[in-house]
């Protein structure tokens, strides 16, 4: 993907962000060498420096933006879009007491929006602003790279307004989001989860490629669009102030694009200057400040919709008073707690936010108030953190947490299995040769290792064949082109019960063991080596053989 960063248009109002969507007829000049007529932008970086002119204390009359005023809701709504906004503020009664908070703890429940998340607000606002500017016209196509919730909001609005909608989202995102998007009539394109945001394979890169190929298409670009924070400045923040009678001492919000926390915080800084703004960023993301908070070996996380590997343009980190990092285990634990103890059917990022809130609000006293933003609903995660099996497989629940009667073999170790010597291939072996080896040896998959035996990834017969049939690779290409790293590992000391949970959702697990290697410098390092590959057939054969011997 080209690294050039075209400058966003700045209209006569001096709008600091891109004032509308990126259309296929945009005015950003970027074409082929020597082609002076070409004005087609290849892409615009979602982390371009912001040129926003907002300043605390600056009169609202000097704002270059169109601002909306909340309308009184009629008894009969003209369409579902009128059910976006005006979400309830609900008191948290048990969790605050459980963690010894003295202050009042309130939840702004954004999953009561029509599409089920806080992103409904920005989706509607971006489309309305684009329509008002004359950029988005009937019959046009909306394309958006998203983790899912913005896509649902856009697809919902597009269904009502009559636009074609294409959503580009990473493979990590839940199947429930995909199902909802399809039901709303959206077209869906999936991208690799581990692709960097600036690579052609990322959800951002693929969205821009589609935009450049499809006539009359537009990327509304939640990462750069001023309508994102403006939606929260004009509506969400005003609702919070009204619901709290202007009295709140702390606001806690998880951060993705940054539009929610930026818009709300700017309004609160103006109207309630004593309120502390707390930002929540998952471990593996780089949004938090100071930079030391982001230092970790972790690069992936399960919680969806928050955190990024770049700083979105719309995120104003200067309005955040303090950052906290959150992890997956506490996120899903607190999300389940909110459901079980408060009856709030919220998603995983709400758990991240609440987990941080009970830490940050320890400094507040009686008579003070903390507001927590709960971004989306549990609807999107029915097969994820709401599932005990999924939680067990991911290691967020322990076997003893579930009081079920286990079979006799449950607590035996993986080392009890009679695993054959592993078949491994080097990344330089051709796809054609690898397929021949797997067929000859009767295997469906094999670990890919380097010359030293260090695990690089896995390759499966099915994945190679589908890649060849789709023309993604040639038979002579190295197998390193089709390896993937999203597979489950298990150790010899793990239980067969844990293996069973993995095999309920995956076709195989890679059995590994640690090796300590000493270097000439006197230092040592630990690396994982392949011990074998185990499948459901291996487990079933072991159980059947043991029961046969006992008879």
From Swiss-Prot:
Pathway: Amino-acid biosynthesis; L-cysteine biosynthesis; L-cysteine from L-homocysteine and L-serine: step 1/2
Pfam families named among the record's database cross-references: CBS, PALP
Documented activity regulation: Allosterically activated by S-adenosyl-methionine/AdoMet. Activated by S-adenosylhomocysteine/AdoHcy. Binds non-covalently to a heme group that may control the redox sensitivity of the enzyme.
Binding site for pyridoxal 5'-phosphate: 149, 256-260, 349
Residue location of crosslink Glycyl lysine isopeptide (Lys-Gly) (interchain with G-Cter in SUMO): 211
Region named Disordered: 1-73
Major localisation: cytoplasm
Coiled-coil residue spans: none
Residues that bear N6-(pyridoxal phosphate)lysine: 119
Positions bound to heme: 52, 65
GO biological process terms held by the UniProt record: cysteine biosynthetic process from serine; cysteine biosynthetic process via cystathionine; homocysteine catabolic process; homocysteine metabolic process; hydrogen sulfide biosynthetic process; L-serine metabolic process
Cofactor: pyridoxal 5'-phosphate
MF (Gene Ontology): cystathionine beta-synthase activity; metal ion binding; protein homodimerization activity; pyridoxal phosphate binding
GO cellular component: cytoplasm; nucleus
Documented EC number(s): 4.2.1.22
Compartments, as annotated in UniProt: Cytoplasm; Nucleus
Keyword Disulfide bond tagged: no
Domain CBS: 418-476
Protein keywords: Amino-acid biosynthesis, CBS domain, Cysteine biosynthesis, Cytoplasm, Heme, Iron, Isopeptide bond, Lyase, Metal-binding, Nucleus, Phosphoprotein, Pyridoxal phosphate, Ubl conjugation
NCBIfam families named in the record: cysta_beta
Biological role: Hydro-lyase catalyzing the first step of the transsulfuration pathway, where the hydroxyl group of L-serine is displaced by L-homocysteine in a beta-replacement reaction to form L-cystathionine, the precursor of L-cysteine. This catabolic route allows the elimination of L-methionine and the toxic metabolite L-homocysteine. Also involved in the production of hydrogen sulfide, a gasotransmitter with signaling and cytoprotective effects on neurons.
Oligomer and partners: Homotetramer.
PANTHER family on file: CYSTATHIONINE BETA-SYNTHASE (PTHR10314)
Protein name per UniProt: Cystathionine beta-synthase
Record organism: Macaca fascicularis (Crab-eating macaque)
Species lineage: Eukaryota, Metazoa, Chordata, Craniata, Vertebrata
Gene, per the UniProt record: CBS
